[in-house]
Amino acid sequence: LHGTNRRQRQMCIRDSRIFVRRAFLDTLGLLPTTHELADFVGDKSAVKRDKLIEDLLNDNNNYAEHWITFWNDCFRNSYTRQYHGGGGGKITEWLKKSLIENKPYDQFVKELINPVQGSDGFIKGISWRGTVNASQVNEMQAAQNVAQVFMGLNIKCASCHDSFINDWTLKQTYSFASIFSDSPMDIHRCDKPTGEKATPAFLYPEIGEINPKAKRPERVKQLAEIITSKKNGRLSRTVVNRLWAIFFGHGLIEPVDEMDNPTWNQDLLDWLAMDFVNNGHNVKHTINLILTSKAYQMPSVPLDEDADEYIFKGPIVKRMSAEQFLDGIDMVIHAASDKFEQRGTGQKRAGLRNLNRLMQTLGRPKRDIVVTRRETVATTAQLIELSNGKAVADLMSRAGEVWSKSGHQPETIINKLFTTTLGREPSEKEKESAKEIVGKNNDPQGISDLFWILAMHPEFQLIQ
């Protein structure tokens, strides 16, 4: 991971601007300001990259407001739909506070499985309107979601019948779901009762046993202790695999929700998981370990979809998320002011806003199911929305108006738009073309058109 041989040193990103932009977006979900970019490029320290990562991880609020998006996808926290018995708003507050505090991951998981005040929405599940089938009752939702999010297990198929895709049985799934039930659960196969009742049990009884005679609160407490115990190496392996997949575009095990699949580097997975546990289940520690590694600092590579076997060559180029795109647009608009030197805009981050059409088109899920990894393949709908959509047009028009009234000369506006949006100054050819678009009188429409061009540019939308 931290190899220092000559070949690896040569393969590290030479362009500081690319690295700092990657680090900002991956850690905080934000673009660096022009001042932060210039300061980093001008820093001659040999350890400036390590210092940058440390600084970014210490920005607790922006860190939390970025990573809350990932966990909201996992927990189906849509902001608008209430969990069973309420609690949507409360889990948002609990989650953000937990991320700001960098709560140890084992404690984080315990408080979600055996809820404290404010964290109970995840286990309560969603109460769907009308009649639901047996595989979507709240107890079964809890079992499916705990297995998927924290252990990388897919038991949804086995919630209806013995699984066709793995070895989990209907009886095992109902036994697991029964831990969350106040009364004995009737087993249903394909929504028809079998006449059997399930006995509460953990999926891996060799790791820990649930007392079937205990009341529900005690059973749930036992489960939280078992899942977060050192015996359950699956918890740590699952989360470090998710982190690796987020930063590199490909997990050590794929898919990330099928942790029984073979890994392409067992030693690395085991070492990362062991280091994670030995350092107090500290998520930021593992992120720092990954982001300061030579592996992370290698040049990005395109996804090779035709390869028979995955071979690590560096981080895979990825698209901005819906939230990163919208936060980036907001930052460029606010950068028109000379007083703008802070990270973020002071406005409500996109990840904390309700879902709208533009966000959904750009890939934010409705959160009616658990999503641990979003689709990243570009769609025709995205192309249409970005090129002709009213929401994007309104954002670009607003940018044109704000920058037109900034008091800057046209050339200054052009340079600032390029450096804020793409992280670099325009080439001479680009500068001449931009001057023709903007005009001599800071035409709002011309500025809007230039910003639209830059916002559609791969250098803006891709994290390289």
Stretch-by-stretch model annotation:
Residues 1-2:
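Short, exposed "boundary/linker" segments that immediately precede the start
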Residues 7-10, 14-206, 234-274, 283, ...:
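Short, structured secondary-structure elements
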